[in-house]
């Protein structure tokens, strides 16, 4: 094992939340990341501020990332899910302090309209957004998050009607 791999594995995971946001047609909000040239689509996610509960963090992050908090939590994941970022990204993310994220996931029903969504927030994360079907979600997600997304889909699938 190389020194950089060992250092990578010694780093902790950043605590965070992820949101599977459903519209009235049970399609899922996905955004294309603004900070990469590759087509990197993902569901909204973000960090937990010290002292904040995961559910409060999820609603705050929803507002920060899609410009709306019109919605309500249907379910919270039973587990913390984690993913590692590719080692070349570690120095570029979170000041190199984390190997990836461990996240609590939330299934959220969006009660607003498309016009309520504004990704041009004060710190934009996405340059495009759209609603994706459950079937297409896993095919458009950035590969290093795919295993985590498969687990989240498996947990929430029965609640998406």
From Swiss-Prot:
EC number: 3.6.1.-
InterPro entries registered for this protein in UniProt: NUDIX_hydrolase-like_dom_sf, NUDIX_hydrolase_CS, NUDIX_hydrolase_dom, RppH
Reported cofactor(s): a divalent metal cation
A biological process term (GO) from this entry: mRNA catabolic process
Superkingdom of origin organism: Bacteria
GO cellular component, one term: cytoplasm
Gene Ontology MF terms in the entry: mRNA 5'-diphosphatase activity
Disulphide linkage map: none
Keywords, ordered alphabetically: Hydrolase
Positions of the Nudix hydrolase domain: 12-154
UniProt-listed Gene3D superfamilies: Nucleoside Triphosphate Pyrophosphohydrolase
Record has Hydrolase as a keyword: yes
PANTHER family, alphabetized: M7GPPPN-MRNA HYDROLASE
Function: Accelerates the degradation of transcripts by removing pyrophosphate from the 5'-end of triphosphorylated RNA, leading to a more labile monophosphorylated state that can stimulate subsequent ribonuclease cleavage.
HAMAP family for the chain: Nudix_RppH
Annotated family: Belongs to the Nudix hydrolase family. RppH subfamily.
Name under which the protein is recorded: RNA pyrophosphohydrolase
Name of the coding gene: rppH
């Amino acid at each position: 094992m190389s020194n950089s791999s060992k250092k990578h594995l010694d780093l902790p995971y950043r605590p965070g939340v992820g949101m599977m946001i459903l519209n009235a047609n049970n399609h899922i909000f996905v955004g294309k990341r603004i900070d990469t040239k590759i087509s990197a689509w993902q569901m909204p996610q973000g960090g937990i501020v010290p002292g904040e509960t995961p559910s409060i963090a999820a609603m705050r992050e929803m507002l920060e990332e899609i410009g709306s908090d019109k919605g309500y939590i249907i379910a919270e994941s039973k587990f913390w899910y984690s993913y590692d970022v590719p080692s070349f990204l570690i120095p570029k993310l979170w000041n190199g302090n984390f190997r990836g994220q461990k996240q609590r996931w939330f299934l959220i029903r969006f009660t607003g309209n498309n016009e309520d969504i504004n990704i041009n927030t004060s710190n934009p994360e996405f340059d495009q957004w759209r609603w994706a079907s459950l079937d297409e979600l896993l095919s458009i997600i950035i590969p290093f998050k795919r295993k985590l997304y498969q687990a989240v889909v498996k947990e929430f699938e029965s609640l998406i009607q």
